Amino acid sequence: MTVLDEAGSSAGEPTDARGRVAELAGIRAQALAGPSEKATEAQHAKGKLTARERIALLLDEGSFQEVEQLRRHRATGFGLEAKKPYTDGVITGWGTVEGRTVFVYAHDFRIFGGALGEAHATKIHKIMDMAIAAGAPLVSLNDGAGARIQEGVSALAGYGGIFQRNTKASGVIPQISVMLGPCAGGAAYSPALTDFVFMVRDTSQMFITGPDVVRAVTGEEISQNGLGGADVHAETSGVCHFAYDDEETCLAEVRYLIAMLPQNNRENPPVAACDDPADRRSEVLLDLVPADGNRPYDMTKVIEELVDDGDYLEVHERWARNIICALARLDGQVVGIVANQPQTLAGVLDIEASEKAARFVQMCDAFNIPIVTLLDVPGFLPGVDQEHGGIIRHGAKLLYAYCNATVPRISLILRKAYGGAYIVMDSQSIGADLTYAWPTNEIAVMGAEGAANVIFRRQIAAAEDPEAMRARMVKEYKAELMHPYYAAERGLVDDVIDPAETRSVLINSLAMLRNKHADLPSRKHGNPPQ
């Protein structure tokens, strides 16, 4: 038997079929083993798994079918002609997650540092095309050093092909990027075009220009993790949707996410068996949410009480914490939940919260996931920084996303729903299919105190006791325009419900809306605020 060496040369070839099969087995063994045991040990020493180990954790056992395993680059110069390892540093193929097809590519950092060259890129292009054609999710396991400099502009063109396919696949198949090493420059742009980004603390970083360039240009001293680590992108930039302490947990959560998503935009999310009664009453909700609108509470406790078995997956958990975006199930059906978080900034909408929720609403709409919105919002965050930062433009993103969504949309007002923020948070007037409210609701243009100061300004100023007059006017305004049934009497709320019945009301409403069909005007595409 003769096996080709890294340079692609051999001393002889087998002449019979059995010999050729034996030769193939040897070549495959070489491709599966990777460059060397030393390279594997170096990868493990960094607390990182190899590409094949990662794929094994992601996919169902024994389901991976590799393609282009024997691919080699054809570059010359800089000694590349003498080093032509199989796979060219990226492993591509498909398998299953809980029995459903998923396509995957994984950079092999042991080969050229996972850097992208021409052959490497075309392998990725092919698997992306296959995923789009098959209508199945695509997961990228990223651990690469950017473009392969030795191959010059061909490597850059390879990135262009990836970006083009990311965009083509957007809203068609779920795209999930898992960052498992340093990813700089072009390697960071592809994940930004996908639906979800996962990162692992201490081992994964994303940035356009690294610490050395930052130091040279600006004089700032910063580490890789300080510049683009998992915590930075999960808490500050919003680039990362999920951050975990180790690869095993990270990949397990990727599997969990995939199980909640449809295969493509033409299918509905999978339905799971549910033992949690659809008509389960939740008396505890009255204790979780204070009737006093000025008292904070944790909205996640409300979500836990409403959804199946208290189980949900929060997206962007640590970024823009004044709003919650989560995937959960109601009677086995996947739903997207958008909820104000009174525990942080009183649940106001600001620039980051608007962007976070808008992106989530668009994702849900693209993949046929009904949206449940839980409102307790006192308005938009005031301030010079917000206005100069473009709160009008950013807030309009959320407004546009809701107005453009054709999936079933149900809104529930728990307490405050004030002003423009109330309208933006999927009010009936912008197309919510059903709007419910608890008897603790306060729906108004603004809070009673502010409204009284505007409407009764002269009476308050002329009163012998302005504070007493103000208190009286506030009480009068609340009684006249903010009582719990004011909006329902005018048809702006479909029903005022007992909080304990919320779960059953939501489930019954979603069942009714399951076959909802809505058409948008014919157009090439909208022009949403950016």
Question: Can you describe what each PLM-predicted range is?
Answer:
Residues 1-530:
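Ligand-binding clefts of soluble mixed alpha/beta catalytic domains
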